[in-house]
Each structure stands twice: as C-alpha cells, then as structure tokens.
Swiss-Prot record:
This is Histidine--tRNA ligase. Coiled coil: none annotated. CDD domains: HisRS-like_core, HisRS_anticodon. HAMAP family: His_tRNA_synth. Belongs to the class-II aminoacyl-tRNA synthetase family. One of its GO terms (cellular component) is cytoplasm. NCBIfam families: hisS. Signal peptide: none annotated. GO terms for molecular function: ATP binding; histidine-tRNA ligase activity. It comes from Ehrlichia chaffeensis (strain ATCC CRL-10679 / Arkansas). The gene is hisS.
Length: 413
C-alpha cells in the first residue's frame, strides 16, 4: 500500500492517549448528568436512509446541499452518514413507538463534508439531548439548565456566554419573513450567491450566513421581537424568567436562528471567545413540528447538541491511571511463573505488563517508567516462595513472601 494512503483521511483524526481520555471523560460526565435529569440512553447507526435528513434539515440547507456524505449501497438504496443526531433520534421515536414524554441521550461521531479547520472536522463527535412531549416553557428552561450544568461541572463557565433568541410561532414567523424579504430585497445584488437563492427559498436562513458581504447587510435587519404575537411574547418571557430564577446569565441575541429548518420558538447557543469562528460549544432549541413532518404524531420537542472536540479543546483535564505493575522474570521457570502471576493480579484489578521472555535485569529496569512497581523473581525467589518488589517512584526495594503480595501492591497502587 502507498505510504500516502496510510495517513488519516482529510478532516478526520486518530485519538490516542490524553485526547481519547478527554473524550471519554466528557462522555461519562455528560451521561451521568443526563441520568440525573431523567434521560435514557439510545444509540443509532451511523448510516440512515438519505430521506431521513433531506425531509427534515431543509432542501436548501448547507448540510443537505453541500455537506452530506451520500452513497448508494449495493441494493440501490440511497444512504447517508449521519450529519446530525436529532433526525435519527426522531426516527427511533416513531419506529419504536416510544411513549412520551421521554428524554433521550445519545452520543457518537457525525459526518459533514466541510473545510477542515480548528475544532471543525469532517468526522466530529457530539453528545445529544432530546426531550419529547412537552410544549411548556419549563421544558426549554430545564434543557438550557442541563447544558449550563454540564459546562459548569466541566469548569468552563468563566468564558461561556448563553445567547438566546425566540423565533416565535407561525404567526410571528410569517409576519417577520415578509418584513425580512422587504428589507433584503433592497440589497439583493450585494448578497452572497447562497443568500440570493435563499431570499426565494428560505429568507430566515440568511440570518445565519457567515459570508462577509452578508454580515454587513444584516447589521440593520429588522428585529424579530417587534413581530412577536402575544403568545410568543408570553412564552419567551417565561423562559427568560425561569433562567433568572435559576441564576443562569444570558444574552438575548435576535440574530440566532440555527442552521436547520426544523427549529422554531426558543433557540440558544453557549458560545466562547477561545475557539475563533467555531465559537458555539452547545447549541439547540425547540422543534415542535419535526416528529409530525417525519410521519409521527404531533409532538412538541426541545433539545441540544454539544461538540466534543470543542469542549475537549477548552477543558483542563489530567488523566490519572492507577499505578501499573511490571514483571521481570529471570530464567525459564520464572517466565512460566510470570504468566500465571500476571493473570492472577489482573483478575484482582491490577494493571500488569511484561515482555513475555527471560529478562536481563539491568536492561529491563531501564525501560520501566518512574511511576511503576516492579516485581523481580528468578530461581532463588521461586525456591523460597518470595518476590522482590521495587517501587520505581521511591527507589525502595523489599523482599516479601508470596502470600503478602496482593496486600503489598494494594497499599502501593
């Protein structure tokens, strides 16, 4: 095989050592907190029928138009590597006839064909939270509180801002769209090519544009709050009141719309200034019409996703493994004995390494880490039923009888 083909595919990354430990820590902590909030875990395949996403994300969304990994399998079915979790979780809800209300936690890799940059890969990882079955502001408040709680336990709140917006009900959205179209039509020729197309297909999506030519025009866009119906205004006020009651600080940002068609009403992002353009660490909102649009019952829902790579880049995590034991057998009989000893110690929860052969003591000790505990034994030790125990951290070495070995190791590890 060509050497070039042994590298990582562009936009993907191997995880080893501390990077992998950080990912595992973020997942464990998130799942633990999700359990406290009444969530149950669900796992979905990384492949879905393409229609699961095209019917829900919006035909003109960046994900559907530019970023999905699509292929036909050998039976001719159109298949997609999942670009996000929510649509797949809704499929599970409908397919398994889950009883609502229900809270679902999921995690794993997702795939989007994007230009790789800091904290933005083509394969990346998310932890995902979905709450199906409540149309009350309290559900929105609790989901935001869950995101805040996780970031708090990750010790990230010092540089995190909760930004929140309210897109409103259908009445609000329809009124605002008309005003937005009227405003943007004045600058149609100056908009990016994508935004000119979206002005016809989905003008709200323009608010999420990152194109420099669009950002300047959007500075003076009409404020959506002026178009709230009474029910929208009351709902948003209750959400903000609930956040105040929980002492969760926030900033109302009416430019947040989220990039997917299924969002409505409350939308929010937890952002940081430490990651450049990829500043959203947690993002989500309400998607009351999604389940029905996929063929299920009319089910209100709210949820969010957290980017694991982005959180990993921010946290200060020190991984500490229990100390390991290294066996140094000297002589043929000692090698045979080492096999049985290693198995016994591992069955008692102790990490054991050895190189499966008769060792030269001096050379073997040079290769042992400073934090390890070394067990040395040869013909003399086997005859006397003893073992030499050397603590590499302190340099102390002692001979102990075999029956005391487990107690001795447990005191040192």
């Amino acid at each position: 095989m060509q050497r070039d083909k042994l590298r990582e595919v562009r936009g993907t990354k191997d995880l080893l050592g501390i990077e992998l430990y950080k990912f595992q820590y973020i997942h464990r902590l998130s799942q633990s907190i999700a359990h406290r909030y009444g969530f149950i875990a669900v796992d979905t395949p990384i492949i879905e029928f393409t229609e699961v996403f095209t019917k829900t994300l919006g035909d003109d969304s960046d994900i559907v138009m530019k970023e999905m990994y699509n292929f036909q399998d050998k039976s001719g079915e159109n298949i997609t590597l999942r670009p996000e979790f929510t649509s797949a979780i809704v499929r599970v809800l409908i397919n398994k006839n889950l009883i609502i209300p229900v809270k679902l936690f999921s995690s794993g890799p997702v795939f989007r064909y994007e230009r790789p940059q800091k904290c933005r890969q083509r394969q990346f990882h998310q932890v995902n939270f979905e709450f199906f079955g409540s149309d009350l502001p309290l559900a929105d408040i609790e989901m935001i509180a869950l995101g805040y709680h996780i970031l708090d336990e990750l010790k990230l709140l010092d540089d995190i801002t909760l930004e929140i917006n309210f897109l409103g009900d259908k009445e609000t959205m329809n009124s605002y769209k008309l005003s937005l179209i009227e405003y943007l039509n004045k600058y149609k020729k100056d908009l990016s090519e994508d935004s000119q197309r979206r002005l016809i297909t989905n003008p709200l999506r323009i608010l999420d544009s990152k194109a420099p030519e669009d950002r300047e025009i959007l500075l003076n866009v009409p404020n959506i709050s002026y178009f709230y119906s009474k029910s929208s205004n009351d709902f948003f006020a209750e959400v903000l009141y609930g956040l105040d009651e929980l002492c969760i600080p926030y900033k109302v940002n009416h430019s947040i719309v989220r990039g997917l068609d299924y969002y409505c009403n409350t939308v929010f992002e937890f952002t940081t200034s430490k990651l450049g353009a990829q500043n959203a660490v947690v993002a989500g909102g309400r998607y009351d019409g999604l389940v029905k649009s996929m063929g299920g019952n009319d089910t209100p829902a709210v949820g969010f996703a957290m980017g694991v790579e982005r959180v990993s880049a921010l946290i200060d995590y020190k991984h500490q493994e229990p100390r390991s034991v290294v066996l140094i057998p000297i002589g043929k009989d000692a090698v045979s004995y080492a096999l049985k000893l290693a198995y016994e110690l591992r069955c008692n929860g102790i990490s054991v390494n050895w190189n499966y052969k008769n060792a030269n003591l001096r050379n073997a000790l040079r290769k042992v880490g400073d934090d390890n505990i070394v067990l040395i034994f040869g013909d003399e030790e086997l005859k006397n039923n003893t073992i030499q125990v050397k603590d590499m951290k302190t340099g102390e070495q002692q001979e102990i009888v075999r029956c005391d070995l487990l107690d001795t190791l447990c005191n040192k590890i």
